[in-house]
Each structure stands twice: as structure tokens, then as C-alpha cells.
């Protein structure tokens, strides 16, 4: 394998796994692009992204432009990034959950263009939140697609794809599995760069994975139990599915659909409470919640939760 000069663009933990895999495979990390530091945590102190933290730890050069558009809101940032990219003289640019739009001048700059690691089986779930949306929709499988980027939103030709079963995964667990797979596939793609067949994405089966908003986390108990349970899994760890109970926001972190039963109580009503779980009426079905959290508290198995919070049948989420 001939080592390549790689520019890597990414921001969250998902991208860090790929960056480390590329470096471990012997490629030169010529430059790392990541989003600017953001306020985070209870103190809202500026915090570097996981990708920047990784780059700093390894001594790789980092640029954090607010935009790459030379004619956009931050032309000085874009111009400085362009100089850094030109100086890096990359063979290829690898992009994973970067968060900035790449204008055409960026796509054209590397010898082999820009490769993207996308956490879905394209063309299903193009966009910002493919892992969450695949779980929420009840998909049996998802996976990783390595694509040759073009100017569209996740519309480029596919180079490699590999599927995984979702099973009962939460977004947190599936994220980690796909991050590892993405690292393995991008290393394979770089080893075969210039020789991989490019497959255009089919026009059929296109769906879009919109960004997850906090307001979506509020549980609608008028939905069937299966749909509610999928949403609980999809929104773990962010934003955390929740529901109001006597004026307090309770997060539900784990649940399953109870065996089919005839339910006459209003949706959201607590039907039974025990150390095994809290049974809640849904649309013609029952959700059995097994892990809960109060504001400011920890995630607790229901038996531990009930030691500090009294729940009774007849109370109602809503």
C-alpha cells in the first residue's frame, strides 16, 4: 500500500474513529478540519470537538473555519482554509460528519477528490441524522456507505457499502458499531483508491434524515407501543425521550412493548407499577418502561427509581 497524504474533515466522536483508523493504516494526516470550539457542559465553557482533540493529541495541524465558502459570511475563514488546503497538497480528502458544506473548489482540490463516510445504506437516509432515523423508522438494517462526494446532499457515487443488523440497538450502541465499520471501510477504500467501481445511487428509495430537534423527544402516547419504544431507542443518548408527569419531566431510557392486551385506559395512564417495570397505556397497546430519570438525577433501573419516586397506577403521563 502506498501511503496517501490525507486531509480529514470531521467533528464528532463518529469521525474520530475514522481519523484514528486512517492514521493507524499508515497514511499521512496532512491537515485536519473540524468545527470551531463550542460552549458545552454545565459551565458552557468552550470545548474542542472530539476530532480536534484527537488531532492535537497526535500533533496534526488543525484548521477550524466557520465556513468554506469564499463568497459567504466568513470569507476570511474560507480564504485561510484554502491556503492551508493548498499547502497540504492532499491526495484525497476524507469527510465524516463534518457539518460544513463543501463548495466545489474543495471537492476539486485533492487529486482523488473527497470521500465521505455516511452512516446509512444510501440512498436511504441522506442527511444529518441517519442513525436516529433508521431506528425510529423500524429499519431492520442500516450500514455504512463510502461515496465519492459531489455538490449534492449525500448524492455522490457509491464506492463501498456494508450492512449491519440494527436489532434492539439504541443510537448510542449503533453509533459505536457504525463508527468502527466506517473506519474499516475507509481504510479499505484508501487502499484501493482509483480502482474502486463507482456506482450511481438509484433514484428509487431516497429518504432524508432530518436533524433531531429537542421537541421531538416528547413522547406521544397516542402512538402504538412499538413506535414509542423505537423512539426511546432512537433518542438515546440525545435528546432523551421524555414525558411530563405531575409537572415533572421524566426521561424514559429503556422500554419494551408488553404482550398484546386490551387497553381501555387513556393513553399515557400508568396501568401497573413494580420493580419489573412501569406499564403505560399507549394506542391499543402497553409500553413497559424499565429505565427512568428525573430532572437532575441519574438514569436508573425502575426498581432503583421507585425507591426515591412514588409512582402509582392511575397517574398519567401527558
UniProtKB/Swiss-Prot annotation:
GO cellular component labels: cytosol
EC id: 2.1.2.9
This protein's UniProt keywords: Protein biosynthesis, Transferase
SUPFAM superfamilies: FMT C-terminal domain-like, Formyltransferase
Keyword Transferase: yes
Catalytic activity as recorded in UniProt: L-methionyl-tRNA(fMet) + (6R)-10-formyltetrahydrofolate = N-formyl-L-methionyl-tRNA(fMet) + (6S)-5,6,7,8-tetrahydrofolate + H(+)
Enzyme class per UniProt: transferase
Similarity comment: family membership: Belongs to the Fmt family.
Biological role: Attaches a formyl group to the free amino group of methionyl-tRNA(fMet). The formyl group appears to play a dual role in the initiator identity of N-formylmethionyl-tRNA by promoting its recognition by IF2 and preventing the misappropriation of this tRNA by the elongation apparatus.
Protein name: Methionyl-tRNA formyltransferase
Species the sequence originates in: Variovorax paradoxus (strain S110)
Name of the coding gene: fmt
